Amino acid sequence: MTLERTGRDEEKALTQPPSGHSSVQAGKVGVLLVNLGTPDGTDYWPMRRYLGEFLSDRRVIEWPRAVWYPILYGIILARRPKKSGALYAKIWNREQNESPLRTFTRAQGQKLATALADKENVIVDWAMRYGSPSIETVTKSLIERGCDRIVMFPLYPQYSATTTATVNDKFFEALIEMRHQPAVRTVPAYPEEPVYIDALVRSIERHLATLDFEPEVVVASYHGIPQSYARRGDPYYEQCLATTARVRERLGWDEKKLITTFQSRFGPEEWLQPYTDKTVEQLARDGVRSIAVINPGFVSDCLETLEEIAVEADRTFREAGGKNFTHIPCLNDSDEGMAVIESLIRREMSGWA
């Protein structure tokens, strides 16, 4: 009798947590959408915090810290927050007091959650690489809500160490201190995925159908990276060209109708070329009167698309003699854009949900 009771007691001890031990929820799959980031406001200090975090990332600026930090903290962060804040103020979502990137990313998360309603064990959330909500905060929140598996989706169609890799880095950093880590998967870049190319083609066709002019040239403008990064093995340049080529094939256009350029260069280094601003200016000087610009590498409209392209590139083109300019919006939370996100997430969740 004593031995039987002892055996039952030992079995009970193995199946029940120790006294005071917190219960562990399990069985859910977290989906984490991550975009680049946004300041919390347009004033000096919110901009300085955001720019400081962004520009101190070793994946973004690969210069030796002894060279870069005096420039960053001594010059750039003293001057650039005011200038950048003024630019953000032009596109700021004043109704929700946030940048459009945050508005669109939240909407993508909400719509994805609705689309995945058939998966009862899935929780969808979103985060930013720089600024808030942070990857660490949201990752911990998913785990606290019972997720023992997480699919993390860096929202960058083309891979670069400056974007996809640094999001992966930050996500893995969030796991380092955890004793009980979740199983994880990361969604790879998708520069030639049929669902993505189809979404871009539909977006282009729909937008051009609303115009009262026919663009002579359509410019596919991607965010640039320093040429030195590409020489050291970053595949971004080739993947951008591949995306443009697939879109061009689907539309039946030639290489003069749809061209690839790169924008947003920063600092003294040579970046990927041709540069967008110089290209639209030269097109106008060469007699082209009507163009359209699309940003295939941006999942959501943001400062670089709404201000740098829709405003500045438009002005540059017209001042050089151009007449008609249109910016084709990013996929954002459109039906086509959400089809891309949902399709890739369902594929990567295979076997989990």
UniProtKB/Swiss-Prot annotation:
Keywords: Cytoplasm, Heme biosynthesis, Iron, Lyase, Metal-binding, Porphyrin biosynthesis. Pathway: Porphyrin-containing compound metabolism; protoheme biosynthesis; protoheme from protoporphyrin-IX: step 1/1. Residues 1-13 have a biased composition (Basic and acidic residues). GO terms for molecular function: ferrochelatase activity; metal ion binding. CDD domains: Ferrochelatase_C, Ferrochelatase_N. One of its GO terms (cellular component) is cytoplasm. The keyword Repeat does not apply. InterPro entries: Ferrochelatase (IPR001015), Ferrochelatase_AS (IPR019772), Ferrochelatase_C (IPR033644), Ferrochelatase_N (IPR033659). The keyword Lyase applies. This is Ferrochelatase.
